[in-house]
């Protein structure tokens, strides 16, 4: 019963200190995330320290003590609730342990298989290279932070950049972003990331060799925010730390605000997911237009494409991956905060189940976006090694051991068998130092101005010092938003319970801006109330400052005030991804006390200007603060070290490392633009030259692919041939195709002359259409598809005859199946202008002479989507995976998934699924491939009876963006017809600038067969509230379809 005595004493303590568990706000925070009150501490002690039987006994005892007193009733209820909390936590911990064990097994198995596939040519020398290459992951801080150490070195680097004119695109979607007077701390979305991306854009824009930087974000025209966030373009002031000497007409750093989502509503980042496609389309439009403008200015008339697209946070990373795939340019990513790490922390608290966490934070959609960034990124930039070793390692798509093996093979020019891993680059954020003048004096003089009166004190000083009874004491400064994970309550408790520290110092808490605590979010307001109660409990009046308002421009003055009083800066967060405020404080001469979890460890190793503490150890925090405040020699040493080493974190040095990483990326851009014979894609010339030129483009494309660099990830049968034989074989094939197309074009030209439609000679025909209808209905049977096509044709029969509306068929069929479908339904190939086949793995155009050559393949499209295509190495792994899927319920253990070689293509590996209900869901196949560093897009289609595996950035929706880029097909003029459900790429077809008609009653079986086991529900990502999305009733007629198109303003009523 000793355990029960302890429990009972804890329960009594809970009743004595602060609000009980039945208090509304305390209950909310207890269920969520707050480490903010003694109540939480006692509850944690009970839940984690005692057996369930002891908790049950305490409840029995409380229940037996019947009394009308309110205290006893509360005690009984509290026992019951804590007992249930303990059981819930135990269950969640068990589930998490099982998941971690399973994950370790899967990763080890995947690593073994990957190494086995690559073991054929693994030599001892290569193994030595692996060990040597690990030096970049060693313990040397200087090695991890390769910085410019002298003016001469910087000048030499600057001279090398002369003549370069790079265009860089940064993306940061959530929060409120503007170039000056940033409202940091206004809400949880407007924090350190906003400051980072703005300063990065400004710093890059001032670097030699960089012509223009665009920071893309969301345009917010809500009346609840400042009007400046609704301005479409803002020129960000160039950093004076930069080294740029030449300017151009459109040069510099710009904040570009793209409208997407609710037009007049500011929404949190968790609600942005359904509108990501709309942002991608708007951003694509801006980049294409800007590339043309820059081409006129600095590109000799040729478009200047971004040298890289850099996404920040998961939502922008998802967008950057799609833009990178659409434009075929390199992608970079910075996570800032990672979903898997947050999920683990929330699960460890035991307050919510995984489903509840996902409902609140849309965490699974966020994690999938982060996995996609690993698939698509050339480089992932982190602030610290801790992010790599403890956070990115949680992801299926990144394995540090396998990454080092692949890197060693690449250095030795040995095949990786289709495996790819992004490079992790540790580049700590920079800082602007031009305005910083470290304070050299102290508070021995007057506190409200200098003696000569020439330099009055900043107003924020008076705002802070009015709280103090003795403002001359050293100031302990904490600057963080009121978030429980920032651990400010432990700091206040440590200060309040350490009498020597209270006697020697004051405490200043800068916790964002507020007007009325009751109007803040429940979490933030509860935390502030808790801090105010602690101030009252420990009687800290006159010793703690907590001003309500400050501007971003006041922050430097706050640092200066703390340094003037010989104070200390503290960051006690439970986990700090980086700790930019620590660098800022050091630049003003402030020693630091910081958490030992995360980025501060690396910062401390470089600056050596303070002490690290366990954020959970209240006494350690108090001791470290007291040591720095009381020992003036230690304080002076830490201050001097910080000022001496702070240049290692300047923005110019950050940008130099950043640009050198970009330079290491393999250059990519739209291939067809390399053709000197390629005239203006949007030419309005009414002649056959368009079609002739594009047939010529096809042969040029092949020539480029043959003359270009070796692609070692295609291990197919043709790779065994001599290169010259392969070259001759492929050129002859395309020459034959070109001749046939040219002949058919010539024959059809005379008949086309009689066509009165403007632009009739253009190839492909989509270039002359006013609107394009994309039929992407994934029907349960081919009869459903044919019925839908005929209804849509009938609905716009007049416009179809006039040629103002064209059609694209987007399907999982290959081109042979498409041709069979058209023949069986009595349709002509020219009824459609283009065919997106194999779920986006192939793109064809209808030919002018359908008898001899009904379809023309777009080979440029293949070169556009081949990024990280695993080729034969991927196919072998897929075949091995398919062989492992066996029907355990069958008598003979039949294979459920088998390779369909007849329907496979160079960029689409097709597999038949014999029993769709028993195959693992698509998320499991993605995980298996990612664990082995194979990057692909697995599409479950045709009601789960087929799996199409295509390049990672290929899809039907991405093919539509390619057509916009290639032919200028206006995305806002597209109407996509889809069923009530569809293949696993269904969500990508709805949303964006294009309009969508959802035909209810079609493809309903897919919801249960292939969408039933998703990571996240479709409702989390589909913009059903968008005015561009409309639903058609079941069995709707062609007349009803026409009415819907009139509602979408596609047709005139």
Curated annotation (Swiss-Prot):
It is an enzyme of class 2 (transferase). It catalyses: beta-D-fructose 6-phosphate + UDP-alpha-D-glucose = sucrose 6(F)-phosphate + UDP + H(+). Coiled coil: none annotated. Keywords: Glycosyltransferase, Transferase. Activity is regulated by phosphorylation and moderated by concentration of metabolites and light. Residues 103-127, 673-693 are annotated as: Disordered. Pfam families: Glycos_transf_1 (PF00534), GT-B_Sucrose_synth (PF00862), S6PP (PF05116). Plays a role in photosynthetic sucrose synthesis by catalyzing the rate-limiting step of sucrose biosynthesis from UDP-glucose and fructose- 6-phosphate. Involved in the regulation of carbon partitioning in the leaves of plants. May regulate the synthesis of sucrose and therefore play a major role as a limiting factor in the export of photoassimilates out of the leaf. Plays a role for sucrose availability that is essential for plant growth and fiber elongation. Belongs to the glycosyltransferase 1 family. This is Probable sucrose-phosphate synthase. It comes from Solanum tuberosum. The lineage of its organism: Eukaryota, Viridiplantae, Streptophyta, Embryophyta, Tracheophyta.
């Amino acid at each position: 019963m000793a355990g029960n005595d302890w429990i009972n004493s804890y329960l009594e303590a809970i009743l004595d200190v602060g609000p009980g568990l039945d208090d509304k706000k305390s209950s909310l925070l207890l269920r969520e995330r707050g480490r903010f009150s003694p109540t939480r501490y006692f509850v944690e002690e009970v839940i984690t320290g005692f057996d369930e039987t002891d908790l049950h006994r305490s409840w029995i005892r409380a229940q037996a003590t019947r009394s009308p007193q309110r205290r006893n009733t509360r005690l009984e209820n509290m026992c019951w609730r804590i007992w249930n909390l303990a059981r819930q936590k135990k269950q969640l911990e068990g589930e998490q342990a099982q998941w971690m064990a399973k994950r370790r097994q899967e990763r080890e198995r995947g690593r073994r298989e990957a190494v086995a596939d690559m073991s054929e040519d693994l030599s001892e020398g290569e193994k030595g290279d692996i060990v040597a290459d690990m030096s970049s992951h060693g313990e040397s801080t200087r090695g991890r932070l390769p910085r410019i150490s002298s003016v001469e070195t910087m000048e030499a680097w600057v001279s090398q950049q002369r003549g370069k004119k790079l265009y860089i695109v940064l993306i940061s979607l959530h929060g409120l972003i503007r170039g000056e007077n940033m409202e940091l701390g206004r809400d949880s979305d407007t924090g350190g990331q906003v400051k980072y991306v703005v300063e990065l854009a400004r710093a890059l824009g001032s670097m030699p060799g960089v012509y223009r930087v665009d920071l893309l974000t969301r345009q917010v025209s809500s009346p609840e925010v400042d009007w400046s966030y609704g301005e479409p373009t803002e020129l960000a002031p160039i950093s004076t730390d930069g080294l740029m000497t030449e300017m151009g007409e459109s040069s510099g750093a710009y904040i570009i605000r793209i409208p997407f989502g609710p037009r007049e509503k500011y929404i949190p980042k968790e609600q942005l997911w359904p509108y990501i496609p709309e942002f991608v389309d708007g951003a694509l439009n801006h980049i294409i237009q800007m590339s043309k403008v820059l081409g006129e200015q600095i590109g000799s008339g040729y478009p200047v494409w971004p040298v890289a697209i850099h996404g920040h946070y998961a939502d922008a990373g998802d967008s950057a991956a799609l833009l990178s795939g659409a434009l075929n340019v390199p992608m970079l990513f910075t996570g800032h905060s990672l979903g898997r790490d947050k999920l683990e922390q929330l699960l460890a608290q035991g307050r919510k189940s995984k489903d509840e966490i996902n409902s609140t934070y849309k965490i699974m959609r966020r994690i999938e976006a982060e996995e996609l960034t690993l698939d698509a990124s050339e480089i992932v930039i982190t602030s610290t090694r801790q992010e790599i070793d403890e956070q990115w390692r949680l992801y299926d798509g990144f394995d540090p051991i396998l990454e080092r093996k692949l890197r060693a093979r690449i250095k030795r020019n040995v095949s990786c068998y289709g495996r790819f891993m992004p490079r992790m680059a540790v580049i700590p954020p920079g800082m602007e130092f031009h305005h910083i003048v470290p304070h050299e004096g102290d508070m021995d003089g007057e506190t409200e101005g200098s003696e000569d009166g020439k330099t009055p004190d900043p107003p924020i000083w008076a705002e802070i010092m009015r709280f103090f009874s003795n403002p001359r004491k050293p100031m302990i400064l904490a600057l963080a938003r009121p978030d429980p994970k920032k651990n400010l309550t432990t700091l206040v408790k440590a200060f309040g319970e350490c009498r020597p520290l209270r006697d020697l110092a004051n405490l200043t808490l800068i916790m964002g801006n507020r007007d009325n605590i009751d109007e803040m979010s429940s979490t933030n307001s509860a935390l502030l109330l808790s801090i105010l109660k602690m101030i009252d409990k420990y009687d800290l009046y006159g010793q703690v400052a907590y001003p309500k308002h400050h501007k971003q421009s006041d922050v430097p003055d706050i640092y200066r005030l703390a340094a003037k009083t010989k104070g200390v800066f503290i960051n006690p967060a439970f986990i700090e991804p980086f700790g930019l405020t620590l660098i800022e404080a050091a630049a003003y001469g402030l020693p630091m006390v910081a958490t030992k979890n995360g980025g501060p460890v690396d910062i401390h190793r470089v600056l050596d200007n303070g002490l690290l503490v366990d954020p959970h150890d209240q006494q350690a925090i108090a001791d470290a603060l007291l040591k720095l405040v009381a020992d003036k020699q230690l304080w002076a040493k830490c201050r001097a070290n910080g000022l001496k080493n702070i240049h290692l974190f300047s923005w110019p040095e950050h940008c130099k490392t950043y640009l050198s990483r970009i330079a290491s990326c393999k250059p990519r851009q739209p291939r067809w633009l390399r053709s000197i014979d390629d005239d203006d894609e949007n030419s309005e010339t009414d002649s056959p030259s368009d079609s002739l030129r594009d047939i010529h483009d096809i042969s040029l494309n092949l020539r480029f692919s043959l003359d270009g660099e070796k692609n070692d990830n295609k291990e197919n049968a043709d790779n065994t041939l001599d290169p010259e034989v392969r070259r001759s074989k492929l050129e002859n094939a395309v020459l034959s195709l070109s001749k046939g197309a040219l002949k058919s074009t010539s024959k059809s030209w005379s008949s086309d002359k009689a066509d009165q439609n403007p632009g009739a000679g253009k190839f492909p025909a989509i270039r002359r259409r006013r609107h394009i209808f994309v039929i992407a209905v994934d029907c349960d049977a081919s009869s459903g598809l044919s019925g839908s096509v005929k209804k849509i044709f009938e609905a716009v029969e007049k416009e179809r005859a006039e040629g103002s509306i064209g059609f694209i068929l987007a399907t999982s069929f290959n081109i042979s199946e498409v041709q069979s479908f058209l023949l069986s339904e009595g349709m002509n190939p020219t009824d459609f202008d283009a065919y997106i086949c194999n779920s986006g793995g192939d793109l064809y155009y209808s030919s002018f002479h359908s008898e001899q050559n009904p379809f023309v393949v777009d080979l440029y499209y293949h070169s556009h989507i081949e990024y990280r295509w695993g080729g034969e190495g991927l196919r072998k792994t897929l075949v091995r995976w398919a062989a492992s899927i066996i029907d355990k319920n069958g008598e003979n253990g039949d294979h459920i998934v088998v390779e369909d070689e007849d329907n496979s293509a160079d960029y689409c590996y097709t597999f038949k699924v014999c029993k769709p209900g028993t195959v693992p869901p698509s998320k499991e196949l993605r995980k298996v491939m990612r664990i082995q560093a194979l990057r692909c897009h697995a599409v479950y289609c045709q009601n789960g009876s087929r799996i199409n595996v295509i390049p990672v950035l290929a899809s039907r929706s991405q093919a539509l963006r390619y057509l916009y880029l290639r032919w200028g097909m206006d995305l806002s003029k597209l109407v996509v017809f889809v069923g009530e459900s569809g293949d696993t790429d269904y969500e990508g077809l709805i949303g964006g600038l294009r309009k969508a008609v959802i035909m209810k009653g079609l493809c309903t079986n897919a919801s249960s067969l292939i969408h039933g086991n998703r990571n996240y529900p479709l409702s989390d990502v589909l913009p059903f509230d968008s005015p561009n999305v409309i639903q058609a009733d079941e069995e709707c007629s062609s007349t009803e379809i026409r009415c819907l198109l009139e509602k979408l303003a596609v047709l005139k009523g």
